[in-house]
């Protein structure tokens, strides 16, 4: 992957109520190219929206890339960097042998992350970071407008 292009991906999720209506926002930047993604869901959680922002952004990349992924979600960053490998080894169960919450999205995230070389960066949310603020706007807007999708994997937890 030494010849792969470097893409910057910024992500954020929003949920009004948690659970409640939610949305995600993602911004992809490569050279002079800039693309924004967003989608709203009728009933979901903030964590699911953070995950879907990351999945949607990575899916947008048609070939393997070096991705510098900036998120304000410790849940997503730590999940991928620290927990997911063990969950996968344990049949998507926690160390306490309980089913992993949001397993459907962790499995999709695992697939997408493995297609790329991802460098994770965490930033504090609402700290004035330009792209994170834009992702937040996209996510909040998506959570309040049609068309909204059903979050098929949300089980009401």
UniProtKB/Swiss-Prot annotation:
It is an enzyme of class 3 (hydrolase). GO terms for cellular component: cytoplasm. One of its GO terms (biological process) is DNA replication, removal of RNA primer. Disulfide bonds: none annotated. Binds 1 Mg(2+) ion per subunit. May bind a second metal ion at a regulatory site, or after substrate binding. It comes from Idiomarina loihiensis (strain ATCC BAA-735 / DSM 15497 / L2-TR). Its main location: cytoplasm. It is found in: Cytoplasm. Mg(2+) 1 binds at residues 12, 50, 72. Its cofactor is Mg(2+). Keywords: Cytoplasm, Endonuclease, Hydrolase, Magnesium, Metal-binding, Nuclease. One of its GO terms (molecular function) is nucleic acid binding. Monomer. Its EC number is 3.1.26.4. Mg(2+) 2 binds at residues 12, 136. The gene is rnhA. It comes from the Bacteria. Endonuclease that specifically degrades the RNA of RNA-DNA hybrids. This is Ribonuclease H. InterPro entries: RNase_H, RNaseH-like_sf, RNaseH_domain, RNaseH_sf, RNaseHI. Belongs to the RNase H family. Pfam families: RNase_H.
């Amino acid at each position: 992957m030494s010849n792969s292009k470097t893409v910057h991906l910024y992500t954020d999720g929003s949920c009004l109520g948690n659970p409640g209506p939610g949305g995600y926002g993602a911004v992809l930047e490569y050279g002079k190219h800039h693309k924004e993604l967003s989608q709203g869901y009728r009933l979901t959680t903030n964590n699911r929206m953070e995950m879907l922002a990351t999945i949607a952004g990575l899916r947008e990349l048609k070939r393997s890339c070096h991705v510098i992924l900036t998120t304000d979600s410790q849940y997503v960053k730590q999940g991928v960097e620290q927990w997911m490998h063990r969950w996968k080894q344990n049949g998507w169960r926690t160390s306490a042998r309980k089913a992993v919450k949001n397993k459907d999205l962790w499995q999709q995230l695992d697939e997408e992350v493995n297609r790329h070389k991802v460098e994770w960066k965490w930033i504090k949310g609402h700290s004035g970071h330009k792209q994170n603020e834009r992702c937040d706007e996209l996510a909040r807007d998506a959570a309040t407008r049609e068309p909204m999708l059903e979050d098929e994997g949300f089980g009401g937890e």
